[in-house]
A protein has these predicted regions:
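Short N-terminal helix/helix-N-cap motif within the alpha/beta-hydrolase-1
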Residues: 56, 74-75
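Phosphate-binding glycine-rich loop
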Residues: 22-69, 83-87, 92-95
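N-terminal "arm"/small-domain region of PLP-dependent enzymes with the aminotransferase-like
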Residues: 1-23, 27
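ATP-dependent adenylate-forming carboxylate-activation enzymes
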Residues: 95-106
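A general structural signal for well-ordered alpha-helical segments in protein cores
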Residues: 11-12, 29, 33, 105
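Conserved coil-to-alpha-helix start sites within the AMP-binding
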Residues: 76-81
Length: 106
């Protein structure tokens, strides 16, 4: 593994946020969301704490839930199936191609 490449400016910003008492939903997060929305030419953007949270929110936005099946590769991280169960849907595991780990239609 590699050590993170952080500038002093980045370290100072993290210290500023930690000292503010707001870690996840404070003014810096709101500023970041507004800048991301502006850059993406959209009205709103939402920061989430993890890829797992993002994937679950995506399923919910798409209306995936009870009675739905979601196809996922068998070779994956556990959260892939967990979030599908969490929204009430059923994960359907499919084989992966040897060497590439892409889903294989067989």
């Amino acid at each position: 593994m590699l050590r993170p490449d952080l500038s002093q400016a980045e370290i100072d910003e993290v210290i500023k946020v930690l000292k503010s008492g707001w870690i996840t939903t404070g003014p810096e997060t709101k500023l970041f969301e507004s800048r991301i929305a502006e850059r993406c030419h959209t009205e709103k953007a939402v920061c989430l704490s993890s890829q797992t949270s993002c994937a679950e929110l995506t399923l919910r936005i798409l209306g995936i839930g009870p009675g739905d099946e979601v196809i996922v590769p068998a070779y994956t991280y556990t959260a892939t199936a967990s979030i599908i169960y969490h929204v009430g849907a059923k994960p359907v595991m499919v084989d992966c191609k040897s060497g590439s780990f892409e889903m294989d239609a067989l």
